[in-house]
Amino acid sequence: MSVLRFLVTRQALAALTRPRTLNIIQNPAQIAYASTLCNQNSNHNAKDLTKSSANLSLMQTRGHKRFGHQEEKTPSVTKYFHMFILSLFLISVMDWGKVKRMLTPKVDADAGQRPSSAADVNGEDKSSESESEDSEDEEAGSDLHLHEGKKIREKVGFRERKIIEYENRIRQFSTPDKVFRYFATIQVPVADDRHEVYMTPTDFLTSMTPGMKQPDGLGLDQYRRYDPKSVGEQLNLHLEKNSIFYKLGSYGLITFSDYIFLLTVLSISRRHFEIAFRMFDLNGDGDVDCEEFEMVATLVRQQTSMGTRHRDHANTGNTFKGVNSALITYFFGPNMDEKLTIEKFLDFQEQLQREILSLEFERKEPNDEGNITEADFAELLLAYAGYPLKKKQKKLKRVKRRFRDHGKGISKQDYLDFFHFLNNINDVDTALTFYHIAGASIDQQTLQHVAKTVAMVNLSDHVVDVVFTIFDENNDNQLSNKEFISVMKNRVQRGLEKPKDTGFLKMMRSVFKCAKETKPVLLDI
């Protein structure tokens, strides 16, 4: 029975899988009719396909860009814009002065002959003057100064300008410890493989003066090694034998404690020192001993922005250890039994200021006659003004243009006399205010009279003329009193009175104090 069922099932499956024979194949008429239907269907499908492809092509042409299969043409406006941007870039980076020198080389009339020494010097002077005039006409901010045919300073590039801005922020906002470590350049070995960092007097000046760039290769914790015990190695500090810096000991070098003390001396006026001395002069004789002087120095240092900002850093070795022992010996004698008078200390302060001014003057490289240019003198006056770069360059260019042809230069004595006049700037401010209230104009003769009356110093006509050129904006030969006084006060104080922070913490402290002391309004309801 099962065998029979198996055979039936296999036969049924074979019948299902066997191809079915069409009867229409055996009839020729039916074959012709079927072929006609197939041709009609194929023609109809071809027409539909052609129509749909045409519609698709039309739709792609109207709405799309063939999906990136066809190269896209750049519009002419875009090409012109790209050419314009590229031209601006090339104009900005190209050294046009060099291009001008290449296209128009200088040809001397006596090129075939060797001129004499005098003619050579005169020729160099004339060519250098013409180069200076061309540079001043081309750029207002050119920093080229000529002394007897010698070029002193080249134009400051982008990299140097950014470094100077960074160093100015260090001077303004950093702690005294970091300022000292950045601008100090000397490292002296001591016992047990340890080293102590020192400043030279030039480093001390650089740490205070904005715009003075630290030499390449020297910076934060980067120093030159110097061994005082080495016979063949000597430091040339360009100081006089009786310099005040040699009284500090350490071969005329400045330690961190000396740095703090000297900044304190420079940042406090004579009047404030006199008051501090009288406060600690218990017997009223005008003298103080060593212990009283330590208290005076501590009190005065705490009143300065530098003193409030300083924190001892034991890990760097920069801790304030009090007044230098060599200075203590200079003030109070080897046995510490002498008294320090206010006159002796003020003489020390005046001598320190005079040496700093001399270093500034010598840094401008005076000519053979010992004079610096009027533009250099203007730069020294405006060093601490805090002007924007364009405003400062405008004033300097006005001075260069004014004294280009008949400049006599500024001697060292005229320079020191003018800054002796500035040491009495508060009294000068009072005197000029009286003139202004009385309705009198402040001309050059008035300023000379005030200097003679207040500071007991005779200002030369040429120095006063340069000062009026700097601060006389409208060329009416009248001094702008407020601007002159504010700039000169900053110059005397060398920016040391400015706070060493951005003011954000002070503002937040004021906000918290106000919120703490103010009663909420809801409590009054």
Swiss-Prot record:
A cellular component term, taken from the record's GO annotations: mitochondrial intermembrane space
A GO term for molecular function: calcium ion binding
SUPFAM superfamilies in the cross-refs: EF-hand
Binding site for Ca(2+) 1: 281, 283, 285, 287, 292
Keywords: Calcium, Calcium transport, Ion transport, Membrane, Metal-binding, Mitochondrion, Mitochondrion inner membrane, Repeat, Transit peptide, Transport
Biased composition (Acidic residues): 130-141
Compartment(s): Mitochondrion intermembrane space; Mitochondrion inner membrane
Segments forming domain EF-hand: 268-303, 459-494
Region (Disordered): 109-146
Phenotypic consequence of gene deletion: RNAi-mediated knockdown results in lethality. RNAi-mediated knockdown in neurons shortens lifespan and severely impairs climbing ability. RNAi-mediated knockdown in the developing eye decreases ommatidia number and disrupts ommatidial array. RNAi-mediated knockdown in neurons and, more specifically, in alpha/beta or gamma mushroom body neurons, impairs mitochondrial calcium entry and decreases intermediate-term memory after conditioning. Does not affect olfactory learning.
Location, primary (coarse class): mitochondrion
InterPro entries membership: EF-hand-dom_pair, EF_Hand_1_Ca_BS, EF_hand_dom, MICU1/2/3
CDD domains: EFh_MICU
Function: Calcium sensor of the mitochondrial calcium uniporter (MCU) channel, which senses calcium level via its EF-hand domains. At low calcium levels, MICU1 occludes the pore of the MCU channel, preventing mitochondrial calcium uptake. At higher calcium levels, calcium-binding to MICU1 induces a conformational change that weakens MCU-MICU1 interactions and moves MICU1 away from the pore, allowing calcium permeation through the MCU channel. Also required to protect against manganese toxicity by preventing manganese uptake by MCU.
Domain notes: The EF-hand domains have high affinity for calcium and act as sensors of calcium levels.
Protein's name in the database: Calcium uptake protein 1 homolog, mitochondrial
